[in-house]
């Protein structure tokens, strides 16, 4: 973006691995900030 303007945050990480049947994993962490 413009000088001094932080980039937008990255997209959420992929879903975590599934645990027991029918149990979805936790969502991954957000991506790193975008470039300035």
Curated annotation (Swiss-Prot):
Q: Which UniProt keywords apply?
A: Collagen, Extinct organism protein, Extracellular matrix, Hydroxylation, Repeat, Secreted
Q: Where on the tree of life does the source sit, at the highest rank?
A: Eukaryota
GO cellular component terms listed in the entry, alphabetical order: collagen trimer; extracellular region
- State whether keyword Repeat applies: yes
What is the first-listed, main subcellular location in coarse terms?
Answer: secreted
Low complexity bias: start-end ranges: 15-29
Positions of post-translational 4-hydroxyproline modification = 6, 12, 33
Give the UniProt subcellular location, in the record's own words: Secreted, Extracellular space, Extracellular matrix
InterPro entries reported for this sequence:
Collagen
Cite the Pfam families for this sequence. Answer: Collagen
Region Disordered, as annotated, extends over: 1-36
Free-text description of this protein's post-translational modifications in UniProt: Proline residues at the third position of the tripeptide repeating unit (G-X-Y) are hydroxylated in some or all of the chains.
* Other known facts: These protein fragments were extracted from an 80-million-year-old fossil. The tryptic peptides required multiple purification steps in order to eliminate contaminants and to increase the concentration of peptidic material.
Q: What does this protein do?
A: Type I collagen is a member of group I collagen (fibrillar forming collagen).
**Which family is annotated?**
Belongs to the fibrillar collagen family.
The annotated subunit structure for this chain is:
Trimers of one alpha 2(I) and two alpha 1(I) chains.
Record-given protein name: Collagen alpha-2(I) chain
Q: Which organism is it from?
A: Brachylophosaurus canadensis
Encoding gene per record: COL1A2
